[in-house]
Amino acid sequence: MPVRAEARAAWRVVALALLLLPAMPAASPPLTPRPLQPSMPHVCAEQKLTLVGHRQPCVQAFSRIVPVWRRTGCAQQAWCIGQERRTVYYMSYRQVYATEARTVFRCCPGWSQKPGQEGCLSDVDECASANGGCEGPCCNTVGGFYCRCPPGYQLQGDGKTCQDVDECRAHNGGCQHRCVNTPGSYLCECKPGFRLHTDGRTCLAISSCTLGNGGCQHQCVQLTVTQHRCQCRPQYQLQEDGRRCVRRSPCAEGNGGCMHICQELRGLAHCGCHPGYQLAADRKTCEDVDECALGLAQCAHGCLNTQGSFKCVCHAGYELGADGRQCYRIEMEIVNSCEAGNGGCSHGCSHTSTGPLCTCPRGYELDEDQKTCIDIDDCANSPCCQQACANTPGGYECSCFAGYRLNTDGCGCEDVDECASGHGGCEHHCSNLAGSFQCFCEAGYRLDEDRRGCTSLEESVVDLDGRLPFVRPLPHIAVLRDELPRLFQDDYGAEEEAAAAELRGEHTLTEKFVCLDHSFGHDCSLTCDDCRNGGTCFPGQDGCDCPEGWTGIICNETCPPDTFGKNCSSPCTCQNGGTCDPVLGACRCPPGVSGAHCEDGCPKGFYGKHCRKKCHCANRGRCHRLYGACLCDPGLYGRFCHLACPPWAFGPGCSEDCLCEQSHTRSCNPKDGSCSCKAGFQGERCQAECESGFFGPGCRHRCTCQPGVACDPVSGECRTQCPPGYQGEDCGQECPVGTFGVNCSGSCSCVGAPCHRVTGECLCPPGKTGEDCGADCPEGRWGLGCQEICPACEHGASCNPETGTCLCLPGFVGSRCQDTCSAGWYGTGCQIRCACANDGHCDPTTGRCSCAPGWTGLSCQRACDSGHWGPDCIHPCNCSAGHGNCDAVSGLCLCEAGYEGPRCEQSCRQGYYGPSCEQKCRCEHGAACDHVSGACTCPAGWRGSFCEHACPAGFFGLDCDSACNCSAGAPCDAVTGSCICPAGRWGPRCAQSCPPLTFGLNCSQICTCFNGASCDSVTGQCHCAPGWMGPTCLQACPPGLYGKNCQHSCLCRNGGRCDPILGQCTCPEGWTGLACENECLPGHYAAGCQLNCSCLHGGICDRLTGHCLCPAGWTGDKCQSSCVSGTFGVHCEEHCACRKGASCHHVTGACFCPPGWRGPHCEQACPRGWFGEACAQRCLCPTNASCHHVTGECRCPPGFTGLSCEQACQPGTFGKDCEHLCQCPGETWACDPASGVCTCAAGYHGTGCLQRCPSGRYGPGCEHICKCLNGGTCDPATGACYCPAGFLGADCSLACPQGRFGPSCAHVCACRQGAACDPVSGACICSPGKTGVRCEHGCPQDRFGKGCELKCACRNGGLCHATNGSCSCPLGWMGPHCEHACPAGRYGAACLLECFCQNNGSCEPTTGACLCGPGFYGQACEHSCPSGFHGPGCQRVCECQQGAPCDPVSGQCLCPAGFHGQFCEKGCESGSFGDGCLQQCNCHTGVPCDPISGLCLCPPGRTGAACDLDCRRGRFGPGCALRCDCGGGADCDPISGQCHCVDSYMGPTCREVPTQISSSRPAPQHPSSRAMKH
């Protein structure tokens, strides 16, 4: 209907509702919304689809048989009543629903109606709820809203979601070089060599010199835009880093023209000279300084000038001292260099021609100074210690672990036998172990927790009421016996008995606790199931009986070391470190040991695993039995003990140091370290001189001098009284330095100065004074006796008290220290070169540098840091921070680009930029210019390097970086970004189309369209709704046309009608499809095939009427029923032909046969052997039995029964199905199950079946022979075997397995030690060497064999083998019963080893050790006694002196050449030499000869074989062996070497000229440069 009519109808309904409402109070009439009308503001019309129901008529038809009168088909009558099928039609109605469009009025989007308002006048804030669905900001408008996105994002098509804007896609984002997009923004990047301008888009070339001067110290030269190089100012050169500059060294070329030293100072070359030279007048050449002429040499005798130095010389008879200046008299005496302070050596000192040679005793070595002896860590060099080693000063000490003690050799360790002392605290037995011991108990006992006491395994205790003893097994009950077992079967029985009697009264403890229910353990938590490792339970099930080798409460612990056997109660008898097998006790011997008990160690002289390796130790040294290392006797050392101790060492291995005073001692005994003193000394360490009146070796001789005359303690000669200051036989020798007085017996007490040889008065050197010369000269004095006055030293210098020269302070030089150091030098004597660089000034005293402007650092090597300038960079720059830096020298500001002014505090004036503000800006459209780079900052709407380009379409604002936010491609203002909407769009973003019924620019025009037509928002053209046409859509579609503007033709066929709007066809009955072109599908009928048939089982539906046409086998209105039984086929008109009561299929008529039948009509029974449903089951009857074809039940033959005839007839029955009872006379008869004939039962035979089967036969009629073995009997009925004790198996053919016995082998043997038991009785059959009920004991020591019945016949300590009685002889014995001792020349076990003794040595039969005769030693007596020893065992010390050897047998001394006498104590008399002093010397008269070689010992001035020739010219001294050192043509004395000067020469070597001549030389011009060098 028209809109207004609908509105009026709605108003009527509302008015009627208001009239029917009950009356309300007049005071508060309710405000109800006014119904919306299209004329009200902001009201929009909508088409709403609703379901509308209405009745639809439907014509139905059905058929029935009615009686009718008819004329045909009547028999003899004209009319008759017949049956006729009639179709009846009737009208019915159904409710049909269809969707209809209805116009409703609602508030336009963005508006709402409040009570009392006419129309929609209230704006809706869509942003208040869930932000309006916007991802970004939500903006509410009057009547609507819109979503916005943050800058850099844009709205997607849904108007709500924001998506990142890739600004780089449009004009590269305005970037000059590279644009990088980021979420919500972007950034510009520049190529290498460019930098980004302040606008963030423009790239400026980097002028590398403008940034920090390019890193250059002086000047930066720009090569390209990005490249530069550094350049130095004149007189400077570039360093390797290419940036810093250093001044060119003037000394680099030609040493600056200097002869010696060239040094740069403030850029100029300054020459210097080496010490001993001075600069000449040209300031470049160096000339020698004559130290002798200037008095700088300070030589005691004479001075000789040399180039650059000088040399002091001494007069004849004197020699130059170590200081190179003092001269000392030459004493013609050979001085022992070791006498003074032991030559500086810490231990031994030996005098040589080159000075003292230090030596160290054994265990020490020389330190780097070659004088001090330091200890050697002997333990690190594999000493002889067997266990532990501790290093000591000069040696080491061996020690042993607990349970061991040190052997007498000081190296090896021997086990301590703890059992030897107090029985080791053991109650029963004690067995010594290596390093320890172990207690053991007798059989039937076990060790207590203290591992010493013994507790009985089963204790017999007399009950308190006096009844018989009862047994309580341990460990459940702790009860002590009232008697003590005897520990040993020896002579101590009386003592043990006394001790037992004493203790009986104390051992009366009763039980502690008892475990119940066959449990045991300290907490009764263990049972027999816990026994491990083959352990079995005791008969009382109160503990585990462990096998050999195991112990512990549950047999989970192996035997402790050195124990074995049952309960680990047997002690191991292994010796020499052998280990014991925990089960059998067999010994496993270590290398070098053999024998059943490891009792056979290696004999002396052999070692190794099998004692086959021969020791190589000399001097009777003993050998380690495993490794063969030699263990030396005292006085010997070396790998083979073949070396005698070196001097000053003694003891085993020469490991001890002699404590003798070596300078006073002749020798140290290498065995015990006793000291043999030199003549003149005595004491244990030879530390004391002979007492007055005694002399000689040991001070045993008394002096024979007159009273008051001293005696020489060495020779006993009487000393002569010399005048003070002299000594010697003829008193011709002056006292040596440091002594004075009579016989030079006084010692000087001067401090570093000599004394007068007569009076002892100190002779002070220059600069010293005082009685002992210990004081320096007073201030202002110097020289001998401090008599000279010091010169006037300047600048705080002091005077040298020895020479009087001024000692200048650092920084000053000159004879009076009046001059400061030359430029470039500083310190004491101005000898240290300054290290100041870059024109830095050096302090002459400290050398500290004062840097030139622009430099700093300790050596002025570092340029000023940025922000500082001036000397030492002490001034801060006064330039504006960040706008410029200052010159490091002058401090003037050097402005950065874009700044100017004295302090770089001003930016460039407008329109200019760059360094010094000299470049002009090029910006357009009023853009601002950067004063540093000249880059332009564009105003809104412009872009480009110079702002010459307007913003591209879609962008606006500053830098055009804002994207327009307009919809539908609307442009925006380039400056403000506001959207310019085209026709048909409106809103801030032009996102909204014109409201309904409006169009054009700004939606200002009204549309004139009807019938639901829409209006084009741009042109106002009407777009008609489907089914209408015309300019204003007022014309309906003509028939045959439909759709929008009625442009489509209808396609309906077969009488179908067409809808003018959608073109849909309405089909008649029986047709369907879009164009009614298809007949109804099966199951559907009526108009449009909209009704469904309900035909079942494949019935066909009539497409017009819906009636069902049923298939074969089915019937009923809907074909829902199958044919009745006995019928089948179409309309169920055919009848079944099945037999045996079988039914047939209602469609095909096929027969369903019952079980046991088959065939087309079920007329045949199942074939033989098959039965059941479809005859598919196979009969299970025996071959001779048949089964029923229906049930499968078997028809059994006579004698069998059961479902499968598997059971024979029960005894007493027979026949078919076992239905008959047997009629046999008694139980000894059996009935045949098939025929019932009676025969004898199994196990019986004979007439009347009364006789049992004889032994060995069984079965019916006793026809079968028994097959039982080993005495087994068989059952007479079944033949089953009954085995006797000791056998088992079906035929008793198997003997009991080892360890079991008795009937069915059900009992376990209790034999020990692996013994077998009798399989019948269980009695143990012990192997030879074992005895006891359970074979748990070995044979006693003197018994052997089976049952230990045989007595051993071993003698001399031989051990008897418990099995066969064979004897194991101890060392040194042989024979079947060890009855023979080893014959001569043989030794060891069974005397199998052959002796190797030499030099008539005899062999010890046990170990094979050789017993050497006098003069020989060694394992085989192969060595004669070492030097210094003789006699039996080389134990006697030779008393020969002078190191002479003695005869090793007799001890007679064999004197060396030059000595004779019984002990070689006498030297050869004058004129004799050689062995025994029997040869005569052949020397000039009065000349002695060497007592050994006989060579003549020429006095000074003589030479030749017989010393009968004078020295030739230029030679002097003893044997003329010294060369003269005389100059000036002088000759030297052939005896003393003193020079005899000629031609006015003087000095000790006659090379000095008189003083008048030397003083005439010119003095040097520059005394400040003098140097003293020698």
Curated annotation (Swiss-Prot):
Superkingdom of this protein's organism: Eukaryota
Example of a GO cellular component annotation carried by this entry: extracellular region
Molecular functions (GO terms): calcium ion binding; scavenger receptor activity
Signal sequence extent: 1-27
Disulfide cross-links: C44-C108, C74-C80, C107-C120, C127-C138, C134-C147, C149-C162, C168-C179, C175-C188, C190-C203, C209-C220, C216-C230, C232-C245, C251-C262, C258-C271, C273-C286, C292-C303, C299-C312, C314-C327, C338-C349, C345-C358, C360-C373, C379-C389, C385-C398, C400-C411, C419-C430, C426-C439, C441-C454, C524-C537, C531-C544, C546-C555, C568-C580, C574-C587, C589-C598, C611-C623, C617-C630, C632-C641, C654-C668, C660-C675, C677-C686, C699-C711, C705-C718, C722-C731, C744-C755, C750-C762, C764-C773, C786-C799, C793-C806, C808-C817, C830-C842, C836-C849, C851-C860, C873-C886, C879-C893, C895-C904, C917-C929, C923-C936, C938-C947, C960-C972, C966-C979, C981-C990, C1003-C1015, C1009-C1022, C1024-C1033, C1046-C1058, C1052-C1065, C1067-C1076, C1089-C1101, C1095-C1108, C1110-C1119, C1132-C1144, C1138-C1151, C1153-C1162, C1175-C1187, C1181-C1194, C1196-C1205, C1218-C1231, C1224-C1238, C1240-C1249, C1262-C1274, C1268-C1281, C1283-C1292, C1305-C1317, C1311-C1324, C1326-C1335, C1348-C1360, C1354-C1367, C1369-C1378, C1391-C1403, C1397-C1410, C1412-C1421, C1434-C1446, C1440-C1453, C1455-C1464, C1477-C1489, C1483-C1496, C1498-C1507, C1520-C1532, C1526-C1539, C1541-C1550
Domain EMI stretches: 40-122
InterPro entries: cEGF, EGF-like_Ca-bd_dom, EGF-like_dom, EGF-type_Asp/Asn_hydroxyl_site, EGF_Ca-bd_CS, EGF_extracell, EMI_domain, Growth_fac_rcpt_cys_sf
Keyword Ribonucleoprotein: no
Name of the gene this protein is made from: Megf6
Tissues and organs where the protein is expressed, per its UniProt entry: Expressed in lung.
Subcellular location: Secreted
Chain positions covered by the region annotation Disordered: 1555-1574
Transmembrane segments: none
Compositionally biased region (Polar residues): 1555-1568
Domain EGF-like: 123-163, 164-204, 205-246, 247-287, 288-328, 334-374, 375-412, 415-455, 520-556, 564-599, 607-642, 650-687, 695-732, 740-774, 782-818, 826-861, 869-905, 913-948, 956-991, 999-1034, 1042-1077, 1085-1120, 1128-1163, 1171-1206, 1214-1250, 1258-1293, 1301-1336, 1344-1379, 1387-1422, 1430-1465, 1473-1508, 1516-1551
Gene3D superfamilies: Laminin, Tie2 ligand-binding domain superfamily
UniProt keyword terms in alphabetical order: Disulfide bond, EGF-like domain, Repeat, Secreted, Signal
SMART domains the UniProt entry points to: EGF, EGF_CA, EGF_Lam
PANTHER family tied to this protein: MULTIPLE EGF LIKE DOMAINS 6 (PTHR24043:SF10), SCAVENGER RECEPTOR CLASS F (PTHR24043)
Annotated protein name in UniProt: Multiple epidermal growth factor-like domains protein 6
